Structures are given as C-alpha cells and as structure tokens.
C-alpha cells in the first residue's frame, strides 16, 4: 500500500449505520472507497462527500461501540473480494471473509465489487433451452441458458423451496460452477442450504455468499454485488456459471433503508428515488458474454401479493422468464404453486422451442383460461348447467391443474413422496395426452403429485 492510501480521518458523527468521517481537505476519499476503522476490521463505504473534508459512509458491520474521534484509514480503493476456485465450497460474508470456520481463503486474485456492465458488442444472446425437470416450468415458462429468471411470490408460497429444487436439479445436472447469494434471508435457510449441498456432494462447485436478515443494511445492499463479482470472474474465465439470488427484494429493501439513512427524499411507497438505477446496475451485469455465460435464478418477494408494487415491477423488465407463484394455487394444495396463466417466458416461440411444444403450451393455457372463465358460473349454477364441451374443458383443466403438481426432491422429508425429475419430452407427451382427450376416462386425483403420465395411469389403477 502506498502512503497516500493510509490517509487518516476522524469520525465526527454516528447515526446508526451512517458514519460521517472528516479527512484533510486535499485528500478526501472518492465515492465507493473503502475505509477501515483503525485497530479493527470494520469497513465503511463512502456514499457522499459533504464538503469541508467530511464524507458520509455506510457501515458494513455492527456500529456498536463507535464514537466520535476514532481514527479511520482510507484504503483508496473500492471493496474487493477474493474470486476464483479457492472460493468454491466456502461460505463468505459481504467482504469475502470466510464465515465457515474452515481457515482463510487462499485466493491470489481479488476483484472490486463495483464493475461496469459488459459493452453491447461483448454480449452473446442465447436461445438454448435449459431443462429443469420441473414440469410446469419446462412447459409454460422454459429457461434459456444464459438467461435471467425470476421466481415471484408472496410470503410462504414456496419461492425458496422452488429455488432449492432448481439448484438441486440444475446444479447437479449442470456440473459447472454455481454462486449462491443469500441476500437478507433467514440464517436457518442458509445453514440448511449449506448442508444440502454438502450431503449431495456438490459443495466443491458452489461459492456461498451470505448477508442475512440480522445484518446491517449496508451488508444486505452489497452482498448481491459480492456474489455477482465472483460469478463474473468465472464467466470471464470462459465458464458457464449459475448465479442464484435469494432474495432480490431484500436488496431493494436494504437500498431503501440506506437511502433513508442518507437523508434522500423517498419516492413511491417509500422506496429510494434511485430504485430503477440500482436495480439496473445489478441486473445489467448479470449477463452472458462471448467468453462465457451467467444463468441467473432470482427469488423475488412480492409484498402483500401485489405485483404492481414498485420493487417487483422494476424487476420484471430485466427478466427473460417470470415464474409467478400464486397463493390461490397453493391453497388448493398444488405445489409447485406456479400460476400457468401469469408465468411467461421469452422462449415461448415456435422458432425456439419447436412447433409441438409451443402448440401444447398454448392449448394447456387455453383450457385453463376457459376453466377460469367458467368458475363463476359453476359456483352459482353448478356443473349441470354447462354445455357438454364446457364440461369436457373443465374436466381436462382440473386434470391439467393437478398434473402441474410434482413431488420435489428437497421436500421429500416433509411430503414422504420421493422427488421426481421429469424430462421435457415426457412433460410434452403427458400434457399432449390430456388435451387430446386420451386421459378423459381417468379420475382427476390420479394426476396429483405424480411425475410422468405413466405414473398417473398406474395411480388410476390403484384407485379403481
């Protein structure tokens, strides 16, 4: 470190996580420079320059015990974290420090968490499908390799369980490296996830970065960037990497807290005025280049189940596929509780997924939409008042609805049913048989919580 890097300043004000530090006027730190409290590992990140040598910083750690007059040193560079293979199999915090008690991370390469998004001419769009083994996702909202996917849902409809199943199915099949960023979620879930990865022997291919619910807003705001920086490094080395974020809403919420602490005027619903810019900075970096790809799966909490809330609404525009989880479907006991009429994907195009897949998807959605329209009539007048065609549509729709459910590997301990991975060909074949009327003679309960259509036929035999 040069002597210029060790310019010292003094704390002049502490308000919660916001710390004002005074430096000599001719050597003020730059925006996003990392400052370190003398005699401790506490890091502060410069957010504003107030003039007269004073900078306003956000504390990346607990501010307990801080007081005016303490000495702070300027590192003269942004927060940098270790990247590369030494991070695999490790749990790190927002600063890239290990928190798994397995010794230091022996990485020679570090990288700043603030990077520019790749230039337009470096991007590489892909239409190659990524099979997940989850019927409703592969059929209704297929994922693209190198694409961005959002799992939208309110509290308790299964975002994290769906995310875990996707990790289980894709990360194990994929065989490449994955990065998991736990942004403001429960520590218990982070612990469960670590042990899940360890038990399935894929931990040596996953880097875990956690900034959990109990941490200060600065940590939760920056931890997504820490995880993304690690994923970008693997991509720039020419690898195809999976990047999981749980939960992108907590990133926004941390931004709101920081914004309020910094004294900015709030915008709609109390969110920060820079919401779109902050989300754009993060999302534009999650992209595939000619060197390698980042396939990203992000859980997005929907406050009060309102998809028009500014936070989920801002996220929508950045995604290639949106998987919307519905409380109404969850209340029917159908899991995964994916809404097949609300969920979309840019891959739903006959030129990308093929004519057969496209037509089956649209026919399934038409049948379900017809059932949705008829539900009020059924509630008031009953099934008997429907025409024979409508009765048939309703029967098929109810079978489709149940066939969209599936037992998950990660939920085996709760359900007692072994998890099922259903290949895309089997998914298309099963739904084709239902919409073509080849399963009209089977009872609808035979389709609930099965994998392939053959299992539904076997279950029907047991029922009858």
From Swiss-Prot:
What keywords sit in the KW lines? ATP synthesis, ATP-binding, Cell inner membrane, Cell membrane, CF(1), Hydrogen ion transport, Ion transport, Membrane, Nucleotide-binding, Translocase, Transport
Write the Enzyme Commission number(s) for this entry.
Answer: 7.1.2.2
Enzyme class, spelled out: translocase
Places the protein is found: Cell inner membrane
Q: What InterPro entries does the record tag this protein with?
A: AAA+_ATPase, ATP-synt_VA_C, ATP_synth_F1_bsu, ATPase_a/bsu_AS, ATPase_alpha/beta_chains, ATPase_F1/V1/A1_a/bsu_N, ATPase_F1/V1/A1_a/bsu_N_sf, ATPase_F1/V1/A1_a/bsu_nucl-bd
- State one molecular function term (GO): proton-transporting ATP synthase activity, rotational mechanism
Q: Name one GO cellular component term.
A: proton-transporting ATP synthase complex
Q: Which is an annotated Pfam family here?
A: ATP-synt_ab
Q: Where does ATP bind?
A: 153-160
Its name, as the record gives it, is ATP synthase subunit beta
**Encoding gene per record:** atpD
């Amino acid at each position: 470190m040069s002597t210029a890097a060790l310019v010292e300043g003094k704390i002049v004000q502490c308000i919660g996580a916001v710390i004002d530090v005074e430096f000599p006027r001719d050597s003020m730190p730059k925006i996003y420079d990392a400052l370190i409290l003398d005699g401790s590992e506490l890091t502060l990140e410069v957010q504003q320059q107030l003039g007269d040598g004073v900078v306003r910083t956000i504390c990346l750690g607990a501010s307990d015990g801080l007081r005016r007059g303490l000495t702070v040193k300027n590192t003269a560079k942004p927060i940098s974290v270790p990247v590369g293979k030494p991070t695999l199999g490790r749990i790190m915090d927002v600063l890239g420090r290990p928190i798994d008690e397995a010794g230091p991370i022996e990485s020679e390469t570090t990288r700043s968490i603030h990077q520019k998004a790749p230039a337009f001419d470096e991007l590489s769009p892909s239409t190659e499908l990524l099979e997940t083994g989850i019927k409703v996702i592969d059929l209704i909202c297929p994922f693209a390799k190198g694409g961005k996917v959002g799992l939208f849902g309110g509290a308790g409809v299964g975002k994290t369980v769906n995310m875990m199943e996707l990790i289980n199915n894709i990360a194990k099949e994929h065989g490449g490296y994955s990065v998991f960023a736990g942004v403001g979620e429960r520590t218990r879930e982070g612990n469960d996830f670590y042990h899940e990865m360890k038990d399935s022997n894929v931990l040596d291919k996953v880097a875990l970065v956690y900034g959990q619910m109990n941490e200060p807003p600065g940590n939760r705001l920056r931890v997504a960037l820490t995880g993304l920086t690690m994923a970008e490094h693997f991509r720039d080395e020419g690898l195809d990497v999976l990047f999981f974020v749980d939960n992108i809403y907590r990133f926004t919420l941390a931004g709101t807290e920081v914004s309020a602490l910094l004294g900015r005027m709030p915008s709609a619903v109390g969110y920060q005025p820079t919401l779109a810019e902050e989300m754009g900075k993060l999302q534009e970096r999650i992209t595939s280049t000619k060197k390698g790809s980042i396939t990203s799966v992000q859980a997005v909490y929907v406050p009060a189940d309102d998809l028009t809330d500014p936070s989920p609404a801002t996220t929508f525009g950045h995604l290639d596929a949106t998987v919307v989880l519905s409380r109404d479907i969850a209340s029917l006991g159908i899991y995964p509780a994916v809404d097949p009429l609300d969920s979309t994907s840019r891959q739903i195009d006959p030129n990308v997924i093929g004519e057969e897949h496209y037509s089956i998807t649209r026919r399934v959605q038409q049948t379900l939409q017809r059932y949705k329209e008829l539900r009020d009539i059924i509630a008031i007048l009953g099934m008997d008042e429907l025409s024979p065609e409508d009765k048939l549509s309703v029967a098929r729709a109810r079978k489709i609805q149940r066939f969209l459910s599936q037992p998950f590997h990660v939920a085996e301990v709760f359900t007692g049913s072994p998890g099922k991975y259903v290949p895309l060909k089997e998914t298309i074949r099963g739904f084709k048989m239902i919409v073509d009327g080849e399963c009209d003679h089977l009872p609808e309960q035979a389709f609930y919580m099965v994998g392939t259509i053959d299992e539904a036929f076997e279950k029907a035999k047991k029922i009858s």
